[in-house]
Swiss-Prot record:
<dbReference type="InterPro" id="IPR050391">
    <property type="entry name" value="Mito_Metabolite_Transporter"/>
</dbReference>
<feature type="transmembrane region" description="Helical; Name=4">
    <location>
        <begin position="164"/>
        <end position="183"/>
    </location>
</feature>
<keyword id="KW-0677">Repeat</keyword>
<dbReference type="InterPro" id="IPR023395">
    <property type="entry name" value="Mt_carrier_dom_sf"/>
</dbReference>
<keyword id="KW-1133">Transmembrane helix</keyword>
<comment type="function">
    <text>Antiporter that transports inorganic anions (sulfate, sulfite, thiosulfate and phosphate) and, to a lesser extent, a variety of dicarboxylates (e.g. malonate, malate and citramalate) and, even more so, aspartate. The sulfate/sulfate exchange is much higher than the phosphate/phosphate and malate/malate exchanges. The transport affinities is higher for sulfate and thiosulfate than for any other substrate. May catalyze the export of sulfite and thiosulfate (the hydrogen sulfide degradation products) from the mitochondria, thereby modulating the level of the hydrogen sulfide.</text>
</comment>
<feature type="repeat" description="Solcar 3">
    <location>
        <begin position="198"/>
        <end position="289"/>
    </location>
</feature>
<feature type="repeat" description="Solcar 2">
    <location>
        <begin position="104"/>
        <end position="189"/>
    </location>
</feature>
<dbReference type="InterPro" id="IPR002067">
    <property type="entry name" value="Mit_carrier"/>
</dbReference>
<keyword id="KW-0812">Transmembrane</keyword>
<dbReference type="GO" id="GO:0005452">
    <property type="term" value="F:solute:inorganic anion antiporter activity"/>
</dbReference>
<dbReference type="InterPro" id="IPR018108">
    <property type="entry name" value="Mitochondrial_sb/sol_carrier"/>
</dbReference>
<dbReference type="GO" id="GO:0005743">
    <property type="term" value="C:mitochondrial inner membrane"/>
</dbReference>
<dbReference type="GO" id="GO:0015698">
    <property type="term" value="P:inorganic anion transport"/>
</dbReference>
<feature type="transmembrane region" description="Helical; Name=2">
    <location>
        <begin position="71"/>
        <end position="89"/>
    </location>
</feature>
<feature type="transmembrane region" description="Helical; Name=6">
    <location>
        <begin position="264"/>
        <end position="283"/>
    </location>
</feature>
<feature type="transmembrane region" description="Helical; Name=1">
    <location>
        <begin position="9"/>
        <end position="26"/>
    </location>
</feature>
């Protein structure tokens, strides 16, 4: 067992913010695609976007380039908290079980990934709610991050800021429990087999693989989570479209079909792919710094 290392926390946060800035417009189109077509919500009933590219072009044309970065402030704040805690906790937990990366197993990595994903996502949930609300509003957004934070708290209370926290934790458990172990195992296999060295090309291939695995595993939960977070629940007023996460899942499947659970898959993957590539390459380079 080794002492707590602060570097994974700092490097994880910096790499997460870098990756978020580079892929944010794709994440915004994913949110817009996922909230549209809800039969029980008049505001989002219309199918405005045919796909990711159409969404980007239409948002740019109708709302301006700035709208593609609606919610970037809470997104960066989220990565500064979520990304920092996620990577730091994951790496620290692994060192509790084994001292050397070569001794890590898939079971250990999955367990550490799931636990770190749940802890970090629960802490960072308010920033996730803010990001999704601001992304969905686009050019109609009123006030900045602080103003929207206060508005949610005043109208919906503390529950509003932690809306969808169970789904966020479930999604994080799936994403982190899949992505980080897949990256580690892929990288380890490529290096130990002699196919590739510990180079940027290995980091690229491993991060591409883990991004695809994460998107396939998490998209249904992501759709339900997005819709639950975007749903307003005014205190003392019963006007919710969905009674809970299971109800949201069943209504989405019943009203829109099974593949509605994979709405936004392409932007989800096209975001997770580049996001993970940028993140892991940045993270691996930061690890080489002699600090």
């Amino acid at each position: 067992m080794t002492a707590l290392n602060w570097k994974p926390f700092i490097y994880g946060g910096l790499a997460s913010i870098t990756a978020e800035c580079g892929t944010f417009p794709i994440d915004l189109t994913k949110t817009r695609l996922q909230v549209q077509g809800q039969a029980n919500d008049a505001k989002y009933k219309e199918i405005r976007y045919r796909g990711m590219l159409h969404a980007i072009v239409r948002i740019w044309k109708e709302e301006g380039v700035k709208a593609l970065y609606s919610g970037i402030a809470p997104a960066m704040l989220r990565q500064a908290s979520y990304g920092t805690i996620k990577i730091g906790t994951y790496q620290s937990l692994k060192r509790l079980f084994v001292d050397c990366p070569e001794d890590e197993t898939l079971v250990i990595n999955v367990f550490c990934g799931v636990l770190s994903g749940v802890v970090s996502s629960c802490i960072a949930n308010p920033t996730d709610v803010l990001k999704i609300r601001m992304q969905a509003q686009g050019s109609l957004i009123q006030g900045g991050m602080i103003g929207n934070f206060i508005n949610i708290y005043q109208q919906e209370g503390t529950r509003g800021l932690w809306k969808g926290v169970s789904l966020t934790a479930q999604r994080a458990a799936i994403v982190v429990g899949v992505e980080l172990p897949v990256y580690d195992i892929t990288k380890k296999h490529l290096i130990l087999s002699g196919l590739m060295g510990d180079t940027v090309y290995t980091h690229f291939l491993a991060s591409f693989t883990c991004g695809l695995a994460g998107a396939l595993a998490s998209n249904p939960v992501d759709v339900v989570r997005t819709r639950m977070m975007n749903q307003r629940s005014i205190r003392n007023v019963s006007n919710s479209s969905y009674k809970g996460t299971l109800d949201c899942l069943l209504q989405t499947w019943k009203n829109e079909g099974f593949f509605a659970l994979y709405k936004g898959f392409w932007p989800n993957w096209l975001r997770l792919g580049p996001w993970n590539i940028i993140f892991f390459i940045t993270y691996e380079q930061l690890k080489k710094l002699n600090l």
